[in-house]
């Protein structure tokens, strides 16, 4: 008889660029549905109860970052370099357009924390109207705009206390294409309307909108 077959799933080792780079009009990854292993530096962390979500990036510039969503808190922190495994998927909010989704790694695990305290990649400086480009999904970016929508805060979960507000390069907040939704990731900032704000953070995108978690 031959060697016993393994029940361990096979993971293809790829770069974040391999996962993210796409020419598809809807921005979908060419690796959707595949189980992959990749490495990057943690640039942002969300913790939702027993769930963990974080963004990792390898290098600077376009196509170098990706959002990871786990069903367990792995305890990673910003500055850790991690090797992760997961399934490539496209996420769109239930009320959004399925053709305007965000590429994620889901149902995954940490293979190793390779090092800690690493310098984060250099943020890409963008005008507000350029933030929504597919190539910057998951990438650390910096942008400056005027606060055109007051902060809405959510403190239902004691371990997920945050506010969201919106900046624009246009005084008309109804022009959504020229605005960025800012999630302050636990900092609970409530800037006054009309304030000029510079925000830096990993960029999330879904339903065609942008959400940047700034560092202050």
Language-model segments: what does each one mean?
Residues 2-10:
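Extracellular fibronectin type III
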Residues 11-216:
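OB-fold nucleic-acid-binding modules
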């Amino acid at each position: 008889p031959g060697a016993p077959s393994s029940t361990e799933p096979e993971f293809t080792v790829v770069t974040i660029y391999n996962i993210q780079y796409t020419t598809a009009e809807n921005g979908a990854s060419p690796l959707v549905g595949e189980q992959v292993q990749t490495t990057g530096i943690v640039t942002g962390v969300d913790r939702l109860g027993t769930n963990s979500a974080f963004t990792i990036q390898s290098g600077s510039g376009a196509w170098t970052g990706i959002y990871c969503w786990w069903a367990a808190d792995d305890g990673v922190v910003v500055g850790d370099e991690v090797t992760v495994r997961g399934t490539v998927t496209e996420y769109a909010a239930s009320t959004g357009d399925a053709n305007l989704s965000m590429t994620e790694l889901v149902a995954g695990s940490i293979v190793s924390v390779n090092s800690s305290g690493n310098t984060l990649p250099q943020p890409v400086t963008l005008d507000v109207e350029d933030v929504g480009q597919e190539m910057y999904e998951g990438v650390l970016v910096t942008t400056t705009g005027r606060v055109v929508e007051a902060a809405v805060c959510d403190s239902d979960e004691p371990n997920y206390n945050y506010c969201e507000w919106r900046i624009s390069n246009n005084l008309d907040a109804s022009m959504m294409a020229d605005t960025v939704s800012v999630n302050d990731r636990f900092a609970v900032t409530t800037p006054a309307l009309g304030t000029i704000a510079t925000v830096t953070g990993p960029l999330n995108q879904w339903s065609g909108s942008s959400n940047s978690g700034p560092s202050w």
